[in-house]
């Protein structure tokens, strides 16, 4: 796969990956407003949940217990609040379908097609983190469960993560 760097019309850097993937490092609201209606078949997003993660004091150590978190104050308060309604309006306008991770944190329409990511945390790890994550989808399908161990330092098959 060939990659190329280029400047966008927003004077931000983007990465082009063949055949048709472009990664943009810009404010998403600036970009969304440049898109036409239904430009994308699918939008997969993981917006800020509004839980203030930068202020949480603990994370998980290698043995599954809690460890003092590093100082992340330099990343700012990006996760202090959920996106404004304008974001949701633009996201729905520019994409035919959506998968929204953390959908349980947001005021979204009713959907049957949720995805449950079972992080396989099990009691043996003795941690206080969630057992899984929810993704809201626009698809009219039954709920689906995806099982993959991911709990801080405990992660399934990280030996060959590039090959996944």
Predicted feature descriptions by range:
Residues 4, 83-84, 153, 164:
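General structural signal for secondary-structure boundaries
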Residues 23-26, 77-82, 163-164:
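Conserved phosphate-coordination/catalytic loops
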């Amino acid at each position: 796969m060939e990659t190329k760097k280029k400047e966008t019309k927003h004077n931000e850097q983007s990465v082009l990956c063949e055949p048709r993937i472009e990664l943009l490092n810009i404010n998403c609201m600036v970009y969304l407003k440049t898109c036409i209606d239904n430009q994308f078949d699918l939008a997969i997003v993981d917006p800020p949940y509004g839980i203030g993660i930068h202020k949480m004091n603990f994370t998980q150590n290698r043995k599954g217990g809690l460890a003092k978190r590093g100082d992340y104050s330099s990343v700012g308060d990006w996760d202090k609040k959920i996106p404004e309604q304008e974001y949701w309006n633009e996201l729905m306008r520019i994409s035919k379908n959506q998968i929204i991770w953390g959908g349980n944190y947001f005021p979204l329409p009713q959907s049957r097609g949720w995805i449950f990511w079972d992080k396989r945390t099990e009691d043996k790890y003795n941690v206080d983190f969630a057992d899984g994550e929810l993704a809201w989808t626009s698809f009219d399908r039954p709920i689906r469960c995806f099982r993959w161990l991911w709990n801080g330092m405990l992660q399934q098959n990280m030996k060959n993560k590039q090959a996944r």
